[in-house]
């Protein structure tokens, strides 16, 4: 039985195998479609808990499954192999063994596609795999490479099938069946095969160039290396236009031949118009670049004259960047790690709570890198391995890193990259390092002591010198906690110290995580505490206000 189906080169057997693969892929694609529709059925996050990367992976998987593993295998591979030899009076296709290979590369492509969703955080690039979202900076793992391999394998299958159908139609017609007597279904398969033969090498070239950009440091689509991301769009949609025509031809193959010819003319018109539009855009851009150069030369003398608003804006941007760099250094000191792989590759990892994803997104927007969920824990990890991004980040935080362990790691990274190491600057009260370290290792909680609620803001660390600055500049107390192998804990509990910390420091240096929400609720906590609203015996409205506060605190 295995040999009967797996080794068969009979066109009808292979058609049945195509249908089986298409049905399986269609069911998987339908399941993904259902999840996508359920997620979009109402505003806000429904089932994926705000995991936008997972949603993007589902979109990619759904599109590739439906187009490359359902529509094309079923309409061309299935119906074509079963009906085309019958309609032209042939016993089989021209190349039966090529037919067998054309099918069996598809399951391998399906394995690559499924594997791509299970590696790293998945290929969340959109089904067109456009750079720069598909570049190594945005998706550093092998997930996108596996998705591209899946596209390569489907392209090989379609190319082999197209060659087979073209040769079969031209050379294996029965006596007396001339081309103008062919059924329209055979014509649609024949034209489709030609379109695939012309367009698939272009798609394969585009995704191969993308693979080279990702893995061999070329810059076909990398702007910083002189590449052009729009080139990929042109290459992909040279194939994409063909896919639309293929689907129309296959779905409406029973229409009159004149209508088929109109569709073909429309496709040719679309291709030509696309090419001419691209040429026109490039000519227009070239003309504009010349005009810009002339304008820049004219304005050179005026460049040094800055209006007061421009000067103010530049100073404000510099101040904001300085605050961000100080905050980032504090976050790295608390939850970060500088690593060196094989004595030559540097990397940075930062792990935060799942609800603080937006803080990592802000870092990613500035320096690149990737973000993925940590398995088994409610945490999310940011990872930066790109050398350009690492150099930019190290220059940003140089002089602000001060954690005992992190300083040693940071110094080694600076030596490897040839960057001068700057010793930590002296901390002042307006330095955002404190809030960055608080976002990483700090907590704000309240507990009941002798039936009275007590609010505590604290920061913990293994080394005394890393929390000593909090006491020196912001006040409070430090004590040694023997639990969890021992650590030092800085804390403030009195109302005056907590409110001073929020009003004098946090207002000027706001937290970039969800801790900021609880800090804002502190004033409400003290107002309700003065009213003794936490007592069940107190006024019912006050107790309801306390319950409402507790609910907001838990949700923050």
UniProtKB/Swiss-Prot annotation:
Residues 1-240 are annotated as: COX1 exons 1 to 4 encoded. One of its GO terms (biological process) is respiratory electron transport chain. PROSITE patterns: COX1. Its cofactor is Mg(2+); Mn(2+). Its main location: mitochondrion. GO terms for molecular function: cytochrome-c oxidase activity; endonuclease activity; heme binding. It is found in: Mitochondrion. It holds the Pfam family COX1. Its EC number is 3.1.-.-. Residues 241-556 are annotated as: COX1 intron 4 encoded. Mitochondrial DNA endonuclease involved in intron homing. It introduces a specific double-strand break at the junction of the two exons a4-a5 of the COX1 gene and thus mediates the insertion of an intron, containing its own coding sequence (group I intron), into an intronless gene. Recognizes with limited specificity and cleaves the sequence 5'-TTTGGTCACCCTGAAGTA-3'. Residues 299 to 556 are sufficient for endonuclease and intron homing activity. Homodimer. This is Intron-encoded DNA endonuclease aI4. It comes from Saccharomyces cerevisiae (strain ATCC 204508 / S288c) (Baker's yeast). The lineage of its organism: Eukaryota, Fungi, Dikarya, Ascomycota, Saccharomycotina. The gene is AI4.
């Amino acid at each position: 039985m295995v040999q009967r189906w797996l080794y068969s080169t009979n066109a009808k057997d292979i058609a049945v195998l195509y249908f089986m693969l298409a049905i399986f892929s269609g069911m998987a694609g339908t399941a993904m479609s259902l999840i996508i529709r359920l997620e979009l059925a109402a505003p806000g996050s429904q089932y994926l808990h705000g995991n936008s990367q997972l949603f993007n992976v589902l979109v990619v998987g759904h599109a590739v499954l439906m187009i490359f593993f359902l529509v094309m295998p079923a309409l061309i591979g299935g119906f074509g192999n079963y009906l085309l030899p019958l309609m032209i009076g042939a016993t089989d296709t021209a190349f039966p063994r090529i037919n067998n290979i054309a099918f069996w590369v598809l399951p391998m492509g399906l394995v690559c596609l499924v594997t791509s969703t299970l590696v790293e955080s998945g290929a969340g690039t959109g089904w067109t795999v456009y750079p720069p979202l598909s570049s190594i900076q945005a998706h550093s793992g092998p997930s996108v490479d596996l998705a591209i391999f899946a596209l390569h394998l489907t392209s090989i299958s379609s190319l082999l099938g197209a060659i087979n159908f073209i040769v079969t139609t031209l050379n294996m017609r029965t006596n007396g069946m001339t081309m103008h007597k062919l059924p329209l279904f055979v014509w649609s398969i024949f034209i489709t095969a030609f379109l695939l033969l012309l367009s698939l090498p272009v798609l394969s070239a585009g995704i191969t160039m993308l693979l080279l950009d990702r893995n061999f440091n070329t810059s076909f689509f990398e702007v910083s290396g002189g590449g052009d991301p729009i080139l990929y769009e042109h290459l992909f949609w040279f194939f994409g236009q063909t896919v639309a025509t293929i689907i129309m031809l296959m779905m409406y193959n029973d229409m009159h031949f004149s209508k088929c010819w109109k569709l073909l003319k429309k496709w040719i018109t679309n291709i030509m118009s696309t090419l001419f539009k691209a040429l026109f855009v490039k000519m227009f851009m070239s003309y504009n670049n010349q005009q810009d150069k002339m304008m820049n030369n004219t304005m050179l003398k005026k460049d040094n004259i800055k209006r007061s608003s421009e000067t103010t804006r530049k100073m404000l941007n510099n101040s904001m960047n300085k605050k961000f760099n100080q905050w980032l250094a504090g976050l790295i000191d608390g939850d970060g790690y500088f690593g060196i792989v094989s004595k030559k590759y540097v990397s940075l990892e930062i792990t935060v709570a799942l609800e603080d994803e937006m803080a990592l997104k802000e870092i990613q927007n500035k320096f690149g890198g990737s973000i993925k969920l940590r398995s088994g824990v409610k945490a999310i990890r940011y990872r930066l391995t790109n050398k350009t991004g690492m150099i930019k980040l190290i220059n940003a935080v140089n002089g602000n890193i001060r954690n005992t362990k992190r300083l040693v790691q940071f110094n080694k990274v600076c030596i490897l990259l040839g960057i001068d190491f700057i010793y930590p600057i002296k901390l002042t009260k307006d330095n955002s390092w404190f809030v960055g370290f608080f976002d990483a290792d700090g907590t704000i909680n309240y507990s009941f002591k002798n039936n009275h609620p007590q609010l505590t803001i604290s920061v913990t660390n293994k080394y005394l010198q890393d929390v000593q600055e909090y006491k020196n500049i912001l006040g409070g107390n430090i004590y040694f906690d023997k639990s969890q192998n021992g650590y030092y804990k800085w804390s403030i509990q009195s109302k005056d110290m907590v409110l001073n910390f929020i009003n004098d420091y946090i207002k000027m240096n706001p937290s970039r995580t969800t801790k900021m929400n609880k800090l804002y609720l502190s004033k409400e906590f003290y107002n309700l505490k003065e009213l003794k609203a936490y007592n069940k015996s107190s006024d019912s409205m006050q107790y309801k206000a306390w319950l409402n506060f507790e609910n907001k605190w838990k949700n923050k």
